[in-house]
């Protein structure tokens, strides 16, 4: 969520050797965003130039800028600003450098060193990019995420008004042509014939196997019968003498 200006300054400052807390102008831009203020670089540099330590902002100088600036409490307004800065949804060093080059006044153009400092302050996890959604979530919570979704929906509505409906929505599912229907019909007929042929071959194979089994059984039966006819009769027992 948005934090008070003094908390944002405390989070981003560094200490000089004399113990004074300061921030460079590029980091003051980040602290301003985190507390709900959009500063112009030229205005920040002007305050830093006239401050106690030329080129740096003290806490008093930063808080004074916040008091004199309009606070962006509306998540929707902040989302519009960030979408204009990063339309693809992420900040990279190149994104910030390009955005700095597009600023109308040359006074507000960030140098390469300032872009690096600004990006390093935003990319605290060293991932190489900063998600706009994550940034809005950190500032406004669910309200920030919903604002980003609304901005994107509005962008799509405007794009459709200019370019028309996306082609994947406009183009209906094509109906099969006569040639395609005939092709499908031939394929289905071939599948049916193939199935009938396989069924017929299976029946013939089963019939042959059954005939062979019957033939084997009959041969074994005849063999057993012939063996029984050729066996000699058992010998007769002689009558006893009665002694």
Swiss-Prot record:
The EF-hand domain, residue ranges: 110-145
Compartment(s): Cytoplasm, Cytoskeleton
Residues covered by region (Disordered): 166-243
Sequence repeats: 181-188, 189-196, 197-204, 205-212, 213-220, 221-228
Biased segments, Basic residues type: 176-196
GO cellular component, one term: microtubule
Keyword Chaperone (UniProt): no
Region (6 X 8 AA tandem repeats): 181-228
Superkingdom to which the source organism belongs: Eukaryota
UniProt cross-references to PROSITE patterns, sorted A to Z: EF_HAND_2
Pfam families named among the record's database cross-references: EF-hand_8
Protein name per its UniProtKB record: I/6 autoantigen
Source organism of the structure: Trypanosoma brucei brucei
């Amino acid at each position: 969520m948005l934090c008070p200006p003094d908390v944002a300054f405390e989070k981003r400052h560094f200490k000089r050797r004399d113990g004074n807390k300061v921030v460079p102008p590029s980091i003051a831009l980040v602290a301003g965003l985190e507390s709900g203020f959009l500063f112009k670089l030229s205005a920040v540099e002007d305050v830093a130039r006239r401050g106690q330590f030329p080129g740096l902002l003290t806490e008093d100088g930063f808080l004074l800028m916040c008091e004199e600036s309009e606070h962006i409490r509306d998540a929707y307004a902040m989302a519009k600003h960030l979408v204009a800065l990063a339309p693809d949804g992420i900040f990279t060093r190149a994104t910030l450098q390009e955005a700095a080059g597009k600023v109308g006044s040359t006074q507000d153009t960030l140098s390469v060193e300032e872009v690096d400092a600004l990006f390093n302050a935003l990319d605290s996890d060293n991932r190489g990019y900063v998600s706009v959604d994550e940034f809005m979530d950190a500032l406004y919570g669910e309200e920030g995420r919903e604002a980003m979704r609304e901005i994107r929906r509005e962008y799509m509505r405007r794009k459709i008004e200019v370019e028309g409906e996306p082609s994947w929505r406009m183009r209906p599912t094509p109906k099969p042509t006569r040639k395609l229907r005939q092709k499908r019909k031939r394929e289905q007929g071939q599948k049916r014939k193939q199935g009938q042929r396989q069924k017929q071959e299976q029946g013939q194979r089963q019939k042959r196997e059954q005939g062979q089994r019957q033939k084997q059984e009959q041969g074994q039966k005849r063999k057993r019968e012939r063996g029984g006819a050729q066996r000699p009769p058992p010998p007769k027992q002689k009558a006893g003498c009665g002694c």
